[in-house]
Amino acid sequence: MNGKKLYISDVTLRDGMHAIRHQYSLENVRQIAKALDDARVDSIEVAHGDGLQGSSFNYGFGAHSDLEWIEAAADVVKHAKIATLLLPGIGTIHDLKNAWQAGARVVRVATHCTEADVSAQHIQYARELGMDTVGFLMMSHMTTPENLAKQAKLMEGYGATCIYVVDSDGAMNMSDIRDRFRALNAVLKPETQTGMHAHHNLSLGVANSIAAVEEGCDRIDASLAGMGAGAGNAPLEVFIAAADKLGWQHGTDLYALMDAADDLVRPLQDRPVRVDRETLALGYAGVYSSFLRHCETAAARYGLSAVDILVELGKRRMVGGQEDMIVDVALDLRNNK
């Protein structure tokens, strides 16, 4: 690591939305954001689980609007930057401007790993606003390291100053992560940062994040108690403990994070965020982690196994945004019984 400080990016209040069907109250947001700020994380991402304007029939309606959540977090932080997520085609530059006015200072512009070209307008506008602008290549396991690097180079060209490898499915292992960071490092400018967003579906969220840092990664996403889609993200407090053991600089208070995870976040989980039969199937089959709750609903409705639905979605190589296909797959499986 050469003595550099890691940038710690918390995603409890965005990816964690998936774990409770986007139902954080404003008071939940204030309490969690304040605890994270007191623990000195660098940024706190806030939005519907599917990003700005994700609240919809397809993805699930949120308890509040993105702007209400962002304002609630911005009101209580003194150190951390408020971040948000935007998926082109769901969120617009108008939504981005509103998020900026509400207090967001970092935006991660997210596309499928082979579709970076749809991010140009949003990345350019974010730079015009003066935002810390990040390219976020979702489902990075679905293309080769070399092709991922080409997509990263496109985002860099549009103006992104940091590019993320995003294991949306929790499907990659440490070798997969190393290969992708080496490919990015070979083509990106030295000043362009890289980041890692892990999911814990194969219990490799922390290990993959460590592998990323060993390959020069600058920013690590994690969440309190792993609060996130599927089996969750890399648990923040666990990653920080491991980073301490490795002698890495991160600037955060481990014990404050441990308290926040157990006292504030874990009690909110109506379904435990953990590796179990269904979440393991996500990682094994390579399925978008936020499909979990939708699949469980469909399985209950049609008298099916959620694992069977998830495995079939993996076979069909469904990607984020195709939540509407979950019911189609369930009906196909029921009719073929």
Swiss-Prot record:
Which pathway does this chain act in?
Aromatic compound metabolism; 3-phenylpropanoate degradation
GO MF assignments: 2-isopropylmalate synthase activity; 4-hydroxy-2-oxovalerate aldolase activity; manganese ion binding
> What is the name listed in the Swiss-Prot or TrEMBL entry for this protein?
4-hydroxy-2-oxovalerate aldolase
Q: Name one GO biological process term.
A: 3-phenylpropionate catabolic process
Question: EC number(s) in its UniProt entry?
Answer: 4.1.3.39
Residues that hold substrate according to the record:
R14, D15, S168, H197, Y288
InterPro entries hit by this protein = 2-IPM_HCS-like, 4OH_2_O-val_aldolase, Aldolase_TIM, DmpG_comm, DRE_TIM_HOA, PYR_CT
Question: Which family is this sequence assigned to?
Answer: Belongs to the 4-hydroxy-2-oxovalerate aldolase family.
Concerning Pfam families, the annotation shows:
DmpG_comm (PF07836), HMGL-like (PF00682)
Instruction: Describe the reaction catalysed, as an equation.
Output: (S)-4-hydroxy-2-oxopentanoate = acetaldehyde + pyruvate
The task this protein performs is described as: Catalyzes the retro-aldol cleavage of 4-hydroxy-2-oxopentanoate to pyruvate and acetaldehyde. Is involved in the meta-cleavage pathway for the degradation of aromatic compounds.
Cite the record's note on assembly. Interacts with MhpF.
Q: List the keywords (alphabetical).
A: Aromatic hydrocarbons catabolism, Lyase, Manganese, Metal-binding
Active-site residues annotated for this sequence: H18
| Domain Pyruvate carboxyltransferase: start-end pairs | 6-258
Site entry (Transition state stabilizer), positions: R14
UniProt binding sites for Mn(2+):
D15, H197, H199
